[in-house]
A protein has these predicted regions:
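Short, surface-exposed amphipathic charged segments that create phosphate/polyanion-binding patches used
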Residues: 96-97, 348, 379
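ATP/Mg2+ or Mg2+-diphosphate-binding catalytic cores
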Residues: 300-342
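Residue-level signature of transmembrane alpha-helix interfaces in integral membrane proteins
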Residues: 60, 125-127, 250, 311-316, ...
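Walker A (P-loop) phosphate-binding motif
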Residues: 337-353, 366
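Low-acidity, Ser/Thr- and Arg-rich intrinsically disordered low-complexity segments
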Residues: 351-359, 363-365, 370-385, 390-393, ...
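Short, compositionally biased leader-like segments
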Residues: 1-10
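Conserved ATP-binding subdomain of kinase catalytic cores across diverse folds
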Residues: 9-206, 211-213, 218-300
Length: 397
């Protein structure tokens, strides 16, 4: 649960000041985003959640600076500066420091991106082009190749994945979430078995860990234009541990979210082009394992909304969303095992019914495994085709 004080007079005053400067306001769990025609200003909320604590002005300044630095890696022309909001002696709020003023808060100033060129919108409106996919993969592989690397031993990497998998079991099986504990436990058992029995596939990936993005979703990806390069916004700035990833896991996560929007062939193209662009491509089985793990992460994030008192009336919706991700996790860990069966006889035979047992509410989830595995022949066309889907909100700012 997010712990936040009642909005103080100072916070309310800062919000009112920013509202007067802007034409549109977006509120998230952790921030307000104030939009003008050309810019966006992000103000962190004074909230506390786990290791994340934004309850002091100094903490909010630091996380703004971190957000600026980290996001400039993939969006150097989008993240412009960190600005102080100051109060004069006569009580007037303004941007920037001047003599006799006192800092009351900090904001990240960004260039506003056109919503029509965000990946989720392009998927929804069927405007995605082949060159968009190629440019995106090229940008991401360049980022992966140049990113800071983490030194981690092969046994420790496997151990860390096992710890994460077990933590998912504990978190998702919490009784108050109301999810199918038997289904969750079976998925976890299959993921654990994969890690224990297929260490030869997993261990070498320890050499590829980078300080990555951590939240590579379609709504965070700007496809660029004739005069503007692609960018990726909104990395996980508040927890470096969550950003230490195998690039293959980042691609698997993005592909999962594209499938959620009905863009199975796009997901296939992203994975195929990434594997073709790297000197050490991950196996198909490992990509499916990472997809299963990513789906568990998304299920957990959806389920956590059930605990939020402000979202109590939407608890059934979030439970359904979590269950759909659990269904996807089950399908992909089964598929990872089938890849291995084709190469050798596995030591354990996963239950063929796991996907069905975990498919509560999954019929409405736009994820067609056969179509993803065998995309249509339109790959030679100038556009990427996939079923029309409603939605596509563009960026959060």
């Amino acid at each position: 649960m997010i712990k936040a004080p009642q909005r103080s007079g100072r916070a309310s005053e800062v919000v009112r000041f920013l509202r007067h400067q802007c034409s549109e306001v977006i509120e998230t769990h952790f921030a307000w985003i104030f939009l003008t025609d050309l810019h966006a200003y992000k103000l962190k909320k004074p909230v506390r959640r786990g290791r994340m604590d934004y309850t002091t002005i100094a903490a909010r300044k630091q996380v703004c600076l971190d957000e600026l630095t980290l996001n400039r890696r993939l969006a150097p022309t989008v993240y412009l500066e960190v600005l102080p909001i100051t109060r004069s002696r006569d009580g007037i709020l303004a941007f920037g420091r001047r003599r006799g003023t006192r800092v009351v808060d900090w904001v990240v100033k960004m260039r506003r991106l056109p919503a029509a060129r965000m990946l989720d919108r392009a998927i929804a409106e069927r405007t995605l082009r082949k060159q968009d996919v190629q440019s995106l993969v090229s940008m991401l592989t360049g980022f992966f190749d140049g990113a800071v690397r983490q030194q981690l031993s092969e046994p420790r990497y496997v151990e860390r994945l096992l710890e994460r998998t077990d933590r998912n079991r504990r978190d998702l099986c919490a009784p108050e979430l109301g999810l199918d504990a038997r289904c969750i436990s079976r998925i976890i058992e299959m993921q654990m078995a994969f890690l224990e029995e297929r260490k030869a596939l997993v261990r070498p990936r320890a050499a590829h860990l980078i300080d990555g993005h951590g939240d590579l979703r379609p709504e965070h990806i700007y496809l660029g234009s004739a005069s503007d390069s692609p960018s990726v916004i909104d990395c996980l700035e508040f927890d470096s541990e969550l950003r230490w990833v195998d690039p293959a896991e980042e691609i698997a996560f993005l592909a999962l979210e594209c499938r959620k929007l009905g863009a199975g062939p796009l997901a296939h193209a992203l994975v195929a082009q990434y594997r073709a662009s790297t000197l050490t491509p991950p196996s198909a089985a490992l990509m499916d394992f990472y997809t299963s793990q990513s789906a568990m992460t998304r299920a957990k994030l959806a389920a956590w909304h059930v605990r939020d008192p402000e979202l109590a009336r939407d608890a059934a919706l979030w439970r359904t969303r979590a269950s759909r991700y659990l269904s996807i996790a089950a399908r992909y860990i089964r598929r990872a095992s089938r890849h291995l069966e084709a190469a050798s006889t596995p030591r354990t035979q996963p239950s063929a019914s796991t996907g069905q047992r975990c498919s509560n509410g999954a019929s409405g989830f736009p994820d067609n495994i056969r179509r993803i595995a065998s995309p249509n022949s339109g790959a030679t066309e100038s556009t990427v085709s996939f079923p029309a889907q409603s939605g596509g909100s563009g960026p959060k700012w």
